[in-house]
Amino acid sequence: MFITFEGIDGCGKTTQAVLLAKYLSDLYGEHRVVLTREPGGTSLNELIRGALLGLTDYKLDGITELMLFIAMRRESFVKVVLPGLLAGKIVISDRFTDSTVAYQGYGCGVDLALVGMLNSLVADVVPDITFVIDASIELALARTSLNGFENHGPEFYDRVREGFRTIVANNPHRCHMIDCKSDAAEDVYSTHDRIVALFRAITQDKLKVAK
């Protein structure tokens, strides 16, 4: 099974991905769960991620950014995601193809057909379940120290947020929007509980993973 978490920077998706990975690891065993992230997931990608995060005043144009992230996705897909799925594991990814559509497509204005074509070329797998964590722009920006490739203004994040909402509306069979209201610990775990309940409802106890 392939599960992805999506949303704007600072929405809380990384925390929720980690919490779900722990929950499923406790349920099925750590050896049956793979947690990865984009950009990142491999030693090479993590080096590139670190370099990108260090770019405080350097701007990439939309096409350059798209091609860079697409190449990193291919590296992660063939080294982490696909092997995990072929081994029958539950793979959880903090970001996947929907992020490219929302960020480079809706956010940067790159042609959506081009984004879709490149996504399909490098990763011909569609997630089984996608949780889109929706948070206000104000809350998200307050949570994160914006730098490097994340250094964009509120208007950009408005476009990206609307992009994610459009993706959810267009893919109701796999995408599920989860509202995140605050940073409070009780809200974080309440969100986790909602995700677990939704996961159980979606799978309907049909997920059979050998321990």
UniProtKB/Swiss-Prot annotation:
Keywords: ATP-binding, Kinase, Nucleotide biosynthesis, Nucleotide-binding, Transferase. One of its GO terms (molecular function) is ATP binding. It catalyses: dTMP + ATP = dTDP + ADP. Disulfide bonds: none annotated. The keyword Kinase applies. GO terms for cellular component: cytosol. Its EC number is 2.7.4.9. ATP binds at G7, I8, D9, G10, C11, G12, K13, T14. It holds the Pfam family Thymidylate_kin. The keyword Hydrolase does not apply. It is an enzyme of class 2 (transferase). One of its GO terms (biological process) is dTDP biosynthetic process. Phosphorylation of dTMP to form dTDP in both de novo and salvage pathways of dTTP synthesis. Belongs to the thymidylate kinase family. This is Thymidylate kinase. It comes from Anaplasma marginale (strain St. Maries). The lineage of its organism: Bacteria, Pseudomonadati, Pseudomonadota, Alphaproteobacteria, Rickettsiales. The gene is tmk.
